Amino acid sequence: MAAKELSHLQQLEAESIQIIREVAAEFDNPVMMYSIGKDSSVMLHLARKAFYPGKIPFPLLHVDTDWKFKEMIAFRDAQAKEFGFELLVHKNPDGIEMGVGPFTHGSAKHTDIMKTQGLKQALNKYGFDAAFGGARRDEEKSRAKERVYSFRDKHHTWDPKNQRPELWRTYNGAVNKGESIRVFPLSNWTELDIWQYIYQESIELVPLYFAQKRPVVERDGMMIMVDDDRLPLEEGETVKDELVRFRTLGCYPLTGAMYSEADTLEKIIEEMLLTRSSERQGRLIDSDQSASMELKKRQGYF
């Protein structure tokens, strides 16, 4: 009797689970980054599957910039309570003390201090030697050339010209003291794969991904949701309730919504089949300068 062939999603799932298990076995102190978005939700689901019926044997880390959507924070805390995983939350205390924010310091400086430097602080504080991330190669060109095991030096910086070969899904995890790796189990997934897997597995998501009426202002060609009273209105701006959803999530002043009527998973998948634009076009931090994502990654960003 012929062995049952795995579907495309089953193959991706098996590959990701194998990577998660291998890192958990090989490294002394791994951690899973948890940004609360759809990719993080899929990665969390895969980690739960990888070690079922036991608990996930490593903590989840959220680097909180203090500017995330309120719904994201509520969802994060609800997921930790429901599934019982260890959740670590880190805010850059220096950035908080300086009052760093996207309006006072600009998107580039805010991202560097609150996300990149905050992440490096947390990794140093807890001594993690491997950190899982939900990045995919189809997202952005600098991520397209990054390995599944992405090596970082003692300063957490990345050298794209000095990456190790990964042949036949064989990964070299040897690191020197003080070095670490970033691990991307979803490297070979596409955005459509993610949505189809979410539908197949009935994975719960932040409601921001689904279309509904939300208060937004149009600014610099993007629709920014008014999530709290810290968003200052510029001259001539008015807040309007529009039927929108978010394709990607980050700090709310730096994340653009899109017009959409997709309020179910089926409608979102149908929308994805027709779209011809990048999901990260709604992320202001990616347009700070040419090759901005690669520069951020070289400096220690995920």
Curated annotation (Swiss-Prot):
Family: Belongs to the PAPS reductase family. CysD subfamily.
Catalytic activity of the protein: sulfate + ATP + H(+) = adenosine 5'-phosphosulfate + diphosphate
Keyword line: ATP-binding, Nucleotide-binding, Nucleotidyltransferase, Transferase
Record SUPFAM superfamilies: Adenine nucleotide alpha hydrolases-like
The EC number(s) this enzyme carries: 2.7.7.4
GO molecular function: ATP binding; sulfate adenylyltransferase (ATP) activity
Quaternary organization: Heterodimer composed of CysD, the smaller subunit, and CysN.
A Gene Ontology BP annotation from the UniProt entry: hydrogen sulfide biosynthetic process
Database matches in InterPro entries: PAPS_reduct_dom (IPR002500), Rossmann-like_a/b/a_fold (IPR014729), SO4_adenylTrfase_ssu (IPR011784), Sulfate_adenylyltrnsfr_sub2 (IPR050128)
Name assigned to this protein: Sulfate adenylyltransferase subunit 2
Function, as annotated: With CysN forms the ATP sulfurylase (ATPS) that catalyzes the adenylation of sulfate producing adenosine 5'-phosphosulfate (APS) and diphosphate, the first enzymatic step in sulfur assimilation pathway. APS synthesis involves the formation of a high-energy phosphoric-sulfuric acid anhydride bond driven by GTP hydrolysis by CysN coupled to ATP hydrolysis by CysD.
Encoding gene per record: cysD
Domain of life: Bacteria
UniProt pathway: Sulfur metabolism; hydrogen sulfide biosynthesis; sulfite from sulfate: step 1/3
